[in-house]
Amino acid sequence: MAEVKVPELAESITEGTIAEWLKNVGDNVDKGEAILELETDKVNVEVVSEEAGVLSEQLAEEGDTVEVGQAVAVVGEGQVNTSNDSSNESSQKDEAKEKETPKQSNPNSSESENTQDNSQQRINATPSARRHARKNGVDLSEVSGKGNDVLRKDDVENSQKSSSQTAKSESKSQNSGSKQSNNNPSKPVIREKMSRRKKTAAKKLLEVSNQTAMLTTFNEVDMTNVMDLRKRKKEQFIKDHDGTKLGFMSFFTKAAVAALKKYPEVNAEIDGDDMITKQFYDIGIAVSTDDGLLVPFVRDCDKKNFAEIEQEIANLAVKARDKKLGLDDMVNGSFTITNGGIFGSMMSTPIINGNQAAILGMHSIITRPIAVDKDTIENRPMMYIALSYDHRIIDGKEAVGFLKTIKELIENPEDLLLES
């Protein structure tokens, strides 16, 4: 017998939530094989077994919060012949547990409910499917499988989605026939638990707002020259760098590095009574995912060329959306860039990332009339840029100077190429 424990994660992570069991009780487990997926404050990680054998016990359920070092499963010796057998065995164990658990008497209970409970027990389903059904009030007798003898968690989830869509359509048809009074307090709402990562993000954003003297300064950038350079070099860049595309993000990343070198206080953070000025340039690139906004870091941007930065950004974006980011991708950065322009944002005041002094916000490129000199007005592609910064560390003069440096480098992109 060997216990599987939650491994040491990043220094700041002490616990996580079991997102999904990847193995059921009775399943064969190889050494180094993942048995569950753990959701942490930053990324999802897989917990693996250090021993080969059979998963004999799950010590926590999906949705439970577990601490680093806590035992979550037991792997014993032996083998199971088929996956169906293991699922049947685990289902029988669940069934036995349910029979052993005394039910509280309820004067309102009916024979039909008891019949439903018994039918739930007779149905062959994996433990995770049963738990999910109990948690969400799904009747397993109404769940259709995928041709297997055993109902699995995804079968229950698919049944939920189908029921939800039916309920929505029924609700719409009912509402179309009658209007609720504006004074009626029972308006339709949907209440659901926030994911661990969503709760953590909400907590940290509030902490940053409350614990920093955050201020935002703005400028505008004429994107004419950088767009022209990108257009001229785009095809050759793709050929020279194995299909890597030249985007605007690499220009802003290199401009940020140059500005950070010129204004080192922007690359700093406060630690107690000390100010730590970082001598490295790990730039966070905000990526939107189904789980919310994630900020993986491109390491050593001062040592990377445009192609390497673009490749790294593309790789991190794919990993973020596929939930494959590691903890090393998400910690110990020095500065962050976020681009609300991809969603159509014209202007915003981004919130500083934790343990940093500032964040740069990019926005939509909008063609508008600009006075290029006192006698000439031309339509130019313009972008508003924003720098939110911690006024405890950075004075207004430095913040404005930093943003002005970004502006000048983007408007004269050849200077960035020379620096690279």
UniProtKB/Swiss-Prot annotation:
The lineage of its organism: Bacteria, Bacillati, Bacillota, Bacilli, Bacillales. Pathway: Amino-acid degradation; L-lysine degradation via saccharopine pathway; glutaryl-CoA from L-lysine: step 6/6. InterPro entries: 2-oxoA_DH_lipoyl-BS, 2-oxoacid_dehydrogenase, 2-oxoacid_DH_actylTfrase, Biotin_lipoyl, CAT-like_dom_sf, E3-bd_dom_sf, PSBD, Single_hybrid_motif. Its cofactor is (R)-lipoate. Residues 91-102, 149-158 have a biased composition (Basic and acidic residues). Residues 81-90, 103-127 have a biased composition (Polar residues). It comes from Staphylococcus epidermidis (strain ATCC 12228 / FDA PCI 1200). GO terms for biological process: L-lysine catabolic process to acetyl-CoA via saccharopine; tricarboxylic acid cycle. This is Dihydrolipoyllysine-residue succinyltransferase component of 2-oxoglutarate dehydrogenase complex.
